[in-house]
Amino acid sequence: MKIGILALQGAFAEHAQMLEKLGIESVELRNLKNFQQHYSDLSGLILPGGESTAIGKLLRELYMLEPIKQAISSGFPVFGTCAGLILLAKEITSQKESHFGTMDIVVERNAYGRQLGSFYTEADCKGVGKIPMTFIRGPIISSVGKKVNILATVNNKIVAAQEKNMLVTSFHPELTNNLSLHKYFIDICKVA
């Protein structure tokens, strides 16, 4: 099994380290040719945290947005953390247009405020158990469609969800030593 990691910005190296600990090979995807070259060998894709507006702009400039969107729309498993969650959202409250727009969620960017508003907590996550959660100016999911399964909440705010083969978190599981969510994603990839 091999997992692609969008490597335009953000914590892509940390996701690769998590996968390595699980014995899973990964490949960094930096441009369209790179994505096309590896796509048929991939079992899934991770969209890491970072700055969603910058990543969205790069995806468009590198002509990667539509091919990746088509793959996700056809059932290709994807795990979006923080900015990756925003990229997948059907609607972003502070923006006119979405990026991939494949997941039936409405997202509020930077809901957890500035860098100083970042925090760490632990909470239960369906299918995984109690896990550590590191929030860095994280978004929140303000509403979900009928087919979206809410996996975790913190202070009554949705911070993890799944719709079919799309898994998202507002927090950064790659910045902890807990492999549970990455294992959960690998299980999604195995049955996809």
Curated annotation (Swiss-Prot):
<comment type="function">
    <text>Catalyzes the hydrolysis of glutamine to glutamate and ammonia as part of the biosynthesis of pyridoxal 5'-phosphate. The resulting ammonia molecule is channeled to the active site of PdxS.</text>
</comment>
<dbReference type="InterPro" id="IPR021196">
    <property type="entry name" value="PdxT/SNO_CS"/>
</dbReference>
<dbReference type="InterPro" id="IPR029062">
    <property type="entry name" value="Class_I_gatase-like"/>
</dbReference>
<comment type="similarity">
    <text>Belongs to the glutaminase PdxT/SNO family.</text>
</comment>
<feature type="active site" description="Charge relay system">
    <location>
        <position position="174"/>
    </location>
</feature>
<dbReference type="GO" id="GO:0036381">
    <property type="term" value="F:pyridoxal 5'-phosphate synthase (glutamine hydrolysing) activity"/>
</dbReference>
<keyword id="KW-0315">Glutamine amidotransferase</keyword>
<dbReference type="GO" id="GO:0006543">
    <property type="term" value="P:glutamine catabolic process"/>
</dbReference>
<dbReference type="GO" id="GO:0042823">
    <property type="term" value="P:pyridoxal phosphate biosynthetic process"/>
</dbReference>
<keyword id="KW-0663">Pyridoxal phosphate</keyword>
<dbReference type="Pfam" id="PF01174">
    <property type="entry name" value="SNO"/>
</dbReference>
<feature type="active site" description="Charge relay system">
    <location>
        <position position="172"/>
    </location>
</feature>
<feature type="binding site">
    <location>
        <position position="109"/>
    </location>
    <ligand>
        <name>L-glutamine</name>
    </ligand>
</feature>
<dbReference type="GO" id="GO:1903600">
    <property type="term" value="C:glutaminase complex"/>
</dbReference>
<keyword id="KW-0378">Hydrolase</keyword>
<dbReference type="GO" id="GO:0004359">
    <property type="term" value="F:glutaminase activity"/>
</dbReference>
<comment type="pathway">
    <text>Cofactor biosynthesis; pyridoxal 5'-phosphate biosynthesis.</text>
</comment>
<dbReference type="GO" id="GO:0005829">
    <property type="term" value="C:cytosol"/>
</dbReference>
<keyword id="KW-0456">Lyase</keyword>
<feature type="binding site">
    <location>
        <begin position="50"/>
        <end position="52"/>
    </location>
    <ligand>
        <name>L-glutamine</name>
    </ligand>
</feature>
<dbReference type="GO" id="GO:0008614">
    <property type="term" value="P:pyridoxine metabolic process"/>
</dbReference>
<comment type="subunit">
    <text>In the presence of PdxS, forms a dodecamer of heterodimers. Only shows activity in the heterodimer.</text>
</comment>
<protein>
    <recommendedName>
        <fullName>Pyridoxal 5'-phosphate synthase subunit PdxT</fullName>
        <ecNumber>4.3.3.6</ecNumber>
        <ecNumber>3.5.1.2</ecNumber>
    </recommendedName>
</protein>
<dbReference type="InterPro" id="IPR002161">
    <property type="entry name" value="PdxT/SNO"/>
</dbReference>
<feature type="active site" description="Nucleophile">
    <location>
        <position position="82"/>
    </location>
</feature>
<feature type="binding site">
    <location>
        <begin position="136"/>
        <end position="137"/>
    </location>
    <ligand>
        <name>L-glutamine</name>
    </ligand>
</feature>
